[in-house]
């Protein structure tokens, strides 16, 4: 499945919530009516079946983190094989992706931009260049912008945006040095309450 490159507002309207796919403190323009489905006339949503609700939740989380279908399925299998709650394990695996950590630290304005920074070899982990967005960051790892990329305007702008919206507690960042530490894997209570991972578990359990 190819990666979606169309309008970001359309995806948020499809899921009925702001997925924060666009840069800025408020990701969507006021004209983007997330209460209505995509399309010129934006039909109101009818009642969904249990399966439809579960599928929409999976698609929402997949789109938030910018993960393709096959990758997401792989993460679920890995989460199910680990000890603990499968849903929480799944969210933690997604949070530990390098592109997501780069976004959480504020080096990229969006996860898509952060993924591009990683792919273009602008990011290092513990002093070593890593260009794999799905690389799993571990507690204590130092994630930094490489010297050759530190003067990029978009990184400075992303750090400003992050300062406005607030940084998560499980990363510690030196904005001047453009370097940060992934202090710990976030607990479920630290993550968005707008995600109902139990619906995803129900979907894959069928």
UniProtKB/Swiss-Prot annotation:
Gene Ontology CC terms: small ribosomal subunit
Occurrences of domain S4 RNA-binding (ranges): 96-156
SUBUNIT field: Part of the 30S ribosomal subunit. Contacts protein S5. The interaction surface between S4 and S5 is involved in control of translational fidelity.
Role summary: One of the primary rRNA binding proteins, it binds directly to 16S rRNA where it nucleates assembly of the body of the 30S subunit.
Keywords: Ribonucleoprotein, Ribosomal protein, RNA-binding, rRNA-binding
HAMAP family according to UniProt: Ribosomal_uS4_B
Name of this protein: Small ribosomal subunit protein uS4
Annotated organism of origin: Ectopseudomonas mendocina (strain ymp) (Pseudomonas mendocina)
GO BP term, pick one: translation
Homology family: Belongs to the universal ribosomal protein uS4 family.
Gene Ontology molecular function, alphabetical: rRNA binding; structural constituent of ribosome
């Amino acid at each position: 499945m190819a990666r979606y490159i169309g309008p970001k507002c359309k995806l948020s309207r499809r899921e009925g919530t702001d997925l924060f796919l666009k840069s800025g403190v408020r990701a969507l323009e006021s004209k983007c009516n997330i209460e209505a489905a995509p399309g010129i006339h934006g039909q109101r949503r009818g009642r969904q079946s249990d399966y439809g609700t579960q599928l929409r939740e999976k698609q929402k989380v997949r789109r938030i983190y910018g993960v393709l279908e096959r990758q997401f399925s792989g993460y679920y299998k890995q989460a199910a094989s680990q000890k603990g709650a499968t849903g929480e394990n799944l969210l933690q695996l997604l949070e530990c992706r390098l592109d997501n950590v780069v976004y959480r630290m504020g080096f990229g304005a969006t996860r898509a931009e952060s993924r591009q920074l990683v792919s273009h070899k602008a990011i290092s982990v513990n002093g070593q260049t890593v260009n794999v967005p799905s690389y799993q960051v571990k507690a204590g790892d130092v994630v930094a912008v490489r010297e050759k990329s530190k003067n990029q305007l978009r990184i400075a702008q992303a750090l400003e945006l992050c300062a406005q919206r607030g940084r998560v507690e499980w990363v510690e960042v030196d904005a001047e040095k453009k370097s940060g530490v992934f202090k710990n894997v976030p607990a479920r209570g630290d993550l968005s309450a707008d995600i109902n991972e139990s619906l995803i578990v129900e979907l894959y359990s069928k």
